[in-house]
């Protein structure tokens, strides 16, 4: 065996060993996705149960408190865009490094991603604390509702660094091949929030009654618990190494995907700001009804979010290991599940949606708004899931711009203009119709684009491999 053959054999062995260490490059595709998705679903469902419990607690306070949460939601979802973007960028780079067997780079990226999350979270928290009142006023909140929204956000902004770090920590664990831990830790944090909520809101166990601010304190402390658990697990598995060398290059690699992902995530809050402003024109009770309905529907939608979040590290590792057929299989399975879950959600919301809303608030207008929401939107969330899966696929393969384009087209080109026009003709029902139509149309386009992109990128990488093989053969001769 000559030197070239020996080097080629050793490289193949290294790639095989690296792929074996990365947990998603071997074994049943469906089983990996089920394990990833099921544990994430447990975590996200528990998180949404906590949000629903929060709505129940605040419904006991007043309808104004529920409306205040509706005005706070576009702001909190904006912060989630930063957390999700940093997490998506880190997940893409880390998963591909895991697939290629570069563990040293993985540990550096994990550490540097968390430092980035802390810095960004602190800056956002300070900015939000300064400008929260102006933003909420611009959304249309007035009087008692405005005061309650500010009370909630003042506490929430203090916990923004904890929030970002907990979301990024979950993403890092998934990217490094841990399927169960992120979901379990997320569920633990949510249970803490459910338990602390009434204590702070109603003043149980000798704690001062804080009202809506108590809901924010419960959330902040629950995120702190999650951070402690994530950090302990990353340290125990030796996935963290306090080395600052190379941090700028790590941040550049993370933000190559994470930057466009943040912009993509910010576009959705922009649409939420517009939609909330449109709904506010119909009264605070309509905003409250929309807020309650979205919290109930989000419980079902988070299953699809779990699927799209889980497929990202799977695609990243297998793309790094050049297992292209496994990537195609994963996309087929998750897209099929998304459509099936959309149909199931539609039927479920028709059967129990109105009843769940009545447990939170018995206001007649709130109930009517929620009923219209459940009749129109849930059937389209399967297509929303397909769009999210396509976005995750692009990011996992290191192609952030298509994901950004999808978000821009969905929100700026289609959704917001359509919602404004529909609101003029059919009121808040028209806004719901615009949401559903946008989900279906953009979901189909995103699926087709992602399918073509995978085939084209695979063909290009196969061509590059063929050219490299020919160069090696010419060197041998």
Positions of predicted regions on the chain:
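Transmembrane helical elements of multi-pass membrane transporters/channels
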Residues: 35-54, 155, 166, 189, ...
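Short runs within selected transmembrane alpha-helices of multi-pass transporters and secretion channels
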Residues: 87, 156-174, 182-190, 215-228, ...
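Hydrophobic transmembrane alpha-helices of multi-pass small-molecule transporters
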Residues: 78-81, 193-198, 227-231, 299-302, ...
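Small-residue-rich hydrophobic transmembrane alpha-helices
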Residues: 66-126, 163-177, 181-182, 289-347, ...
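Short alpha-helical transmembrane segments in multi-pass integral membrane proteins
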Residues: 1-40, 94-161, 207-259, 315-380, ...
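N-terminal transmembrane alpha-helices
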Residues: 24-56, 60-61, 74-89, 93, ...
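Structural signal for membrane-spanning alpha-helices in multi-pass inner-membrane proteins
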Residues: 128, 171, 197, 201, ...
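Helix-terminus/linker motif at the lipid-water interface of multi-pass membrane proteins
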Residues: 45, 49-67, 136-143, 199-210, ...
